[in-house]
UniProtKB/Swiss-Prot annotation:
The keyword DNA repair does not apply. It comes from the Eukaryota. GO terms for molecular function: ribose-5-phosphate isomerase activity. Present with 5680 molecules/cell in log phase SD medium. Its EC number is 5.3.1.6. Pathway: Carbohydrate degradation; pentose phosphate pathway; D-ribose 5-phosphate from D-ribulose 5-phosphate (non-oxidative stage): step 1/1. Belongs to the ribose 5-phosphate isomerase family. This is Ribose-5-phosphate isomerase. It holds the Pfam family Rib_5-P_isom_A. InterPro entries: NagB/RpiA_transferase-like, Ribose5P_isomerase_type_A.
Length: 258
């Protein structure tokens, strides 16, 4: 690694094992998958681990050896948070409308199963995240080791499958999820203490969280949910990820790939 881009094994601890794990996963994912000769359009996802993805890419701007190439990267955000991450790290901002074909995308996950199927959307950006990740030739997941399921989705992540819906369809979709798809519990996601009422996405939709317990066939469940009138998108990301990096608190990283 050239001077100016810190070596992973020489990094000082952040003083928080969980943050160390996230940083290790993100830095290694960027270093091993970002190809300077081939990648120009980069998708930047949402969430706490992706903070370190944007940070790592931004570090290449500070190295004279990489500056010329890194300054030409165009980064596509999945929402307001990732837009700010891109700008805060002095990276060039683009949009999915301008660049509908993305070379590589990095994003986090709420849970990853043994087949690299994902639950995403805990941050309420699932439609934009899926739009960016499925537009990318390569999609890399970065997360800490808590997000790795031993087998099925729904084992570790117990908040349910996030589903983005048209606001006026809330009652209809909730009833269909309970009666047709036998969800154990369905809740409309509420805003925090500073905001009364439901969470509103960047696309002015609502988010439902539907608990199906452990999900042995996420592909089938995704198809069934998508057929319900009023559903915009599900937080089940099927056959999308190429590779997942899981950071451990000791700084080591596990890699899962297809």
């Amino acid at each position: 690694m050239a001077a100016g881009v810190p070596k992973i094994d020489a990094l000082e601890s952040l003083g928080n094992p969980l943050e160390d794990a996230k940083r290790a996963a993100a830095y290694r994912a960027v270093d091993e998958n970002l190809k300077f000769d081939d990648h120009k359009i980069i998708g930047i996802g949402s969430g706490s681990t992706v903070v370190y993805v944007a940070e790592r890419i931004g570090q290449y701007l500070h190295d004279p050896k990489f500056y010329e190439v890194a300054s030409k990267f165009i980064c596509i955000p999945t929402g307001f948070q990732s837009r700010n991450l891109i700008l805060d790290n002095k990276l060039q901002l683009g949009s999915i409308e301008q660049y509908p074909r993305i070379d590589i995308a990095f994003d986090g996950a709420d849970e990853v199963d043994e087949n690299l199927q994902l639950i995403k959307g805990g941050g309420a950006c699932l439609f934009q995240e899926k739009l960016v990740s499925t537009s990318a030739k390569t999609f890399i997941v970065v997360a800490d080791s808590r997000k790795k399921s031993p087998k099925h989705l729904g084992k570790n992540w117990r908040q349910g499958v996030p589903i983005e819906i048209v606001p006026s369809s809330y009652v209809r979709v909730k009833n269909d999820l309970l009666e047709q798809l036998h969800a154990e519990k369905v809740d409309i996601r509420q805003g925090g203490s500073a905001k009364a009422g439901p969470v509103v996405t960047d696309n002015n939709n609502f988010i439902i969280d539907a608990d199906f317990g452990e999900i042995s066939d996420p592909r089938k469940l995704h198809r069934e949910i998508k057929l319900l009138v009023g559903v915009v998108e599900t937080g089940l990301f099927i056959d999308n990820a190429s590779k997942a990096y899981f950071g451990n608190s000791d700084g080591s990283v596990e890699v899962t790939e297809k």
